């Protein structure tokens, strides 16, 4: 945690100090600091507090009309004065999270080269594959503890954005700090530029990435391996989060590295953890267990299958067999229900096929079973959308589900907002207010027949900042499935609906710091229990979490020659 009474000794001075975002205070430099660091005359006369700076910055922010302009403005503050940026965001977290991350970050990625102002993080091009160690040594932050890396191929639901995908690691790490208290000095966003197959990007004269079709196969795998080895040489204890890799690479990369380095995939494991946590809270509020639910997924990619496997693991922990748990989970993709004997299924999909014996008495008018067929025959109590295809949870689908389930749980999780499977307002209306709805992107509360229904954002930001904080606080060497499961349970324990029987399914973002600390403690405890972190007392662990929790306050500076 920051201690603003303890001075920080730095050698930067003059314009160089004002140009260093991690150290710049702008108008908050004291008269003594201005004299000591050659800043006199470089700043207006008034010395301000950080709260006075926040008031001005917020006034300027409110002056922008479009979300994109607001995003650009906040990114400019981040690249000028990081402490001010995080104080501003923390003061207005609910309002600004959709601007710095989903859904606005999607448009920012699509327009990355057009709105580019200043470099942040590392752009590691395939053309420089023989110099990755040198590139890592060029990073602005030297004591890196958390890396978010993407290759830009599957950015949200927007597909291949090339280096435009850098907006995602930048946004994710902003939330590691704003929500999880991880110092921005410890973070590094990385994009692996292996080209792009997006014809719009390649044809755009403004595009700033490597103009080449995507590298694939062994060349791609070797490039990622070189990067991972270089990171291990430079920062052997860093946590690496894989972000927005295409389905064909996401799961294989996770399987290849999860037992070698401290890493996880947020799209697969983070999404699974927050979804399981939300479902556990919903079940607790209803007086039931997850193992009693029948769950249908629309979308059987790596994210959907990752959520399904996490749900099955939780069901088994509640006392049912793995076989029984799998029989209660129905995966539907564009070709229909995944069934045994279907051709061309990926390895991670094979474990989630439904046995013919479970569907032999079902009725259908088609070859195979559509989503509507599954809803009608399986009678699910939970419907999860991770398809990236808008509007597929139709009125017919939702009403069919509601016929056999008085309080359906419906999670249209696809991002950004334009890709959501159904609008929350429609789901509430079609079920006469009886559905419990959570979404992947933010939506306003729904007013239906005089009653207001809060729409919870089932967002990974409830989970990954706490995981990162727990890994750092415990000095964990790996991120295990059991650690992720504990994060889900910790999140569920924070649910106002589960605790009080009313209120939102997940806690408000204004309490995200306490949520992240609770998740961090649960994750760290499990890491110690599993032997992937040094053994310490609970008291020492809590102290470590507080010590690692960075706050956006200005420290006093003292001049050093070195």
Swiss-Prot record:
The active site is at residues 101, 172. GO terms for biological process: malate metabolic process; pyruvate metabolic process. It is an enzyme of class 1 (oxidoreductase). Divalent metal cations. Prefers magnesium or manganese. Its EC number is 1.1.1.38. GO terms for cellular component: cytosol. It holds the Pfam family malic. A divalent metal cation binds at residues 243-244, 267. It comes from the Bacteria. NAD(+) binds at residues 154, 267, 415. InterPro entries: Aminoacid_DH-like_N_sf (IPR046346), Malic_enzyme_CS (IPR015884), Malic_N_dom (IPR012301), Malic_N_dom_sf (IPR037062), Malic_NAD-bd (IPR012302), Malic_OxRdtase (IPR001891), NAD(P)-bd_dom_sf (IPR036291), NAD_malic_enz_proteobac (IPR023667). This is NAD-dependent malic enzyme. The gene is maeA.
